[in-house]
Every structure is written in C-alpha cells, then in structure tokens.
Regions:
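Conserved, structured core segments of small domains
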Residues: 1-130
Length: 130
C-alpha cells in the first residue's frame, strides 16, 4: 500500500536550516539520501521532495466569479509542510518505521531533528469510467 509521509516544521525559525553549518547540512542530506537509496533498492521508494518555504506559498480557492489567490499558508497555522516522501510498503508499521528514520536524521551537532511526520495511506477509489 502507498503512504505519504508529510514532514512538517514550525513557521517560527523557518530559516533555521540555512543557519546550520555546511557540515551539519551535508550530514543531514547524506542520511536522507541513504534512506532513499535503501528504499529504492527494496522497491519501496516512490518519490520524495522538499518544498519551498511558506513565504512562497499561495492558497487558491475556486469560488464563484473566479479563483482568488492569497499569499502564504493559513495565518493561524503554526506549522507548514517541509516536504514529503511517498513509499509503497506492505504494512502501516513499515511506513511508521521509515518515518521514524527520516525524523531521526541528524540536525545541528548531530542531534536528531525529530521533525514531526504525518503518515497517511492513499485512499482507494474507483477509476473513472471512460
């Protein structure tokens, strides 16, 4: 079953990753790259992508008379989406284990980032009729 692993971060201090030392950023990305390679080798990897910061986000709603576009994530939101992974695994427990490894990737000084990761299964639906 496919799962999406949604990585979230706090809006406060959103630029903190850029303040990390190059050594810490390299170590963090090396762990995430290793996890991605391992998942690809096992056939469980589908996709991963980091996202631009909340200052670049737009919200679009299809409303009567047009599609208004507003800036940013919802103002009342304290967290924002950092990025995601999509995995195709046999059990929810396997998805949880992968999320735990991603969350434990090192941050400054080698300490785990403990980024919250929401794990959600893909909904099943019927294919549209031709």
């Amino acid at each position: 079953m496919k799962y999406i692993l949604l990585m979230t971060g706090m809006k406060v201090g959103v630029e903190s990753y850029l303040a990390w030392s190059q050594k810490d950023r390299d170590a963090h990305m090396a762990v995430l790259d290793r996890i991605a390679r391992e998942l690809a080798a096992s056939g469980e990897f589908v996709a991963t992508q980091g996202l631009a910061g909340p200052q670049e986000a737009k919200v679009v709603r299809g409303e009567k008379g047009g599609m208004p576009v507003t800036d940013g994530v919802f103002p009342e939101s304290k967290e924002f989406l950092l990025g995601y992974w999509i995995v195709d695994v046999a059990t929810p427990e396997r998805a949880y284990a992968i999320a735990g490894r991603i969350s434990a990737a090192p941050g400054p000084g080698g300490m785990p980032t403990n980024v919250p990761i929401e794990v959600r299964g893909f909904a099943s639906y019927r294919e549209p009729k031709s």
